[in-house]
Amino acid sequence: MNPALLHAVQSANGVDLERAEDAARELLLALGEDPDRDGLRETPGRIAKAYAELLSPEPFSPTTFPNDEGYDELVIARGIQFNSLCEHHLLPFGGVAHVGYLPGDRIIGLSKLGRVVDLFARRLQVQERLTSEIAAWIDEHLEPKGVGVVIEAEHLCMSLRGVQKPGTLTATSALRGLVRDDPRTRQEFLALAARQT
């Protein structure tokens, strides 16, 4: 099992709020703003606390259970909403993750799939790595016959700045095991992930 993945679950993110607040104040000054004026006086502290919250995943215990029923079809949690921060611009991106697996000997509580998404989303990220990390975590902890993750997200670094194309969605996928290698299972997963409710 990958020690880095276990570490991510078991350790809390250490944030120096005082230092972050000082840095936010310096940023405001560098942008030509007066951090001592009425509207900005509390802003550096708010920025520090907001980023600390956005970048601190909730630790959880990855409880798994024996697959006593021998369930051998896909398990998919669709439309898991998430928000993250682009590591290039520190601007938010968010959307939905569709996470599925083909059980082997172990299964996991459905709520844990949402927690896994948050575990990796609540850090500085790029969407491609986020997608792969979620798939790797499920593969490591469950040892399923296959894993599929599809993420669709809007990036504010693309909507608010640069090309300024609001509403543009980026889709990424990470497929492993039979979800990648078996054409029928792959097609079923992708169809279920794309299905509109």
Language-model segments: which ranges?
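A domain-level signal for the structural core that forms small-molecule/cofactor-binding pockets
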Residues: M1-T197
